């Protein structure tokens, strides 16, 4: 009799352990691809999102973050998200314009006067206009993340005037408006995926590139670039995009939990990114790059060049694109 009670107790304890272990295992494992290092604001934001999702779903959903293009280049990642074979891709909006051309309006040179205006637009009417266009192409918009104003780096000379940039071969964003802007400045624009940029700079395939301080510092571009000129020509936000196919298969409570976590992670990432970009210029200089301001009078010359391509962009992007451009211009007056 006593022996039977012992057996029963052991069986019950074993069942409890198995049930506990099963309860702790996530029901859904989602992969999140980030193109940058884990130290960049995007990388830290991705880790924050991972933790917030785990908390909000009580462990039912696990987000696995893969940094520094570990799952492949951005372009392939976006295609996989559309197909439902990858759950999340973090990307600058320029790459997304390959699928949703109207996204290219967000990287018109000298469109945004400041970051606050940009996010007010994206959290408001501009974002509401773009979100269904993304959804139609298979992307569930999870958040607009900050990256900061882009500036030009190169190995030839400091850029203080339009004459200084003429003749440089620069890696640029893969959008028509971005390429047209640099071509109008006399640059040889060379779009390429971010995964290819460091070796291209190292081998002299291109003279330079253009990115915010967070990218320049955390991606260690001081190892392969000499000059960093604060041209402030584009403020390109990031997109956290989830596969529409994956999102719609999740129960409603988990969908709500993920979007709630995304909202909190977005607020957190924006604050971190803006703090980084304010502080990192000194670290970039300490790492060996020569950092120079561009005089306001010179920035006005760059803006004049930029204005020439707005009409071309509006014609290329159709009625919806023109509506977005007009809205962006009006918001930045």
Spans of model-derived segments:
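N-terminal secretory/targeting leader peptides
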Residues: 8-13, 24-117, 125-333
């Amino acid at each position: 009799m006593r022996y039977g009670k012992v057996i029963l107790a052991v069986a019950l304890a074993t069942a409890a352990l198995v049930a506990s272990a099963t309860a702790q295992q996530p029901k859904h494992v989602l992969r999140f691809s980030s193109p940058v290092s884990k130290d960049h604001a995007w990388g830290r934001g991705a880790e924050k999102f991972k933790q917030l999702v785990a908390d909000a779903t009580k462990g039912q959903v696990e987000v696995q973050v893969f940094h520094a293009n570990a799952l492949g280049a951005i372009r392939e990642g976006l295609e996989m998200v559309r197909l439902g074979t990858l759950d999340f891709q973090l990307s600058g909006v320029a790459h997304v314009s390959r699928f949703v051309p109207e996204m290219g309006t967000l990287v018109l040179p000298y469109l945004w006067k400041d970051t606050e205006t940009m996010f007010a637009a994206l959290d408001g009417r501009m974002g509401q206009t773009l979100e269904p266009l993304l959804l139609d192409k298979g992307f569930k918009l999870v958040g607009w993340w900050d990256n900061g104003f882009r500036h030009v780096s190169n190995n030839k000379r400091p850029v203080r005037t339009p004459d200084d940039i003429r003749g440089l071969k620069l890696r640029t964003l893969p959008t028509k408006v971005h390429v047209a802007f640099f071509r109008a400045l006399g640059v040889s624009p060379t779009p390429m995926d971010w995964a290819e940029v460091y070796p291209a700079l190292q081998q002299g395939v291109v003279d330079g590139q253009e990115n915010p301080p967070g990218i320049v510092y955390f991606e260690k571009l001081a190892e392969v670039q000499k000059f960093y000129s604060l041209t402030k020509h584009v403020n390109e936000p990031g997109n956290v995009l989830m596969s529409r196919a994956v999102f719609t298969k999740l129960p409603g409570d988990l969908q709500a939990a993920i979007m709630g976590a995304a909202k909190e992670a977005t607020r957190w990432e924006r604050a971190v990114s803006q703090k980084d970009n304010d502080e990192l210029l000194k670290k970039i200089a300490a790492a060996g790059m020569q950092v120079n301001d561009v005089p306001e009078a010179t920035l006005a010359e760059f803006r004049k060049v930029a204005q020439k391509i707005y009409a071309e962009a509006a014609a290329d992007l159709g009625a919806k694109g023109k509506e977005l451009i007009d809205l962006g211009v009006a918001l930045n007056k």
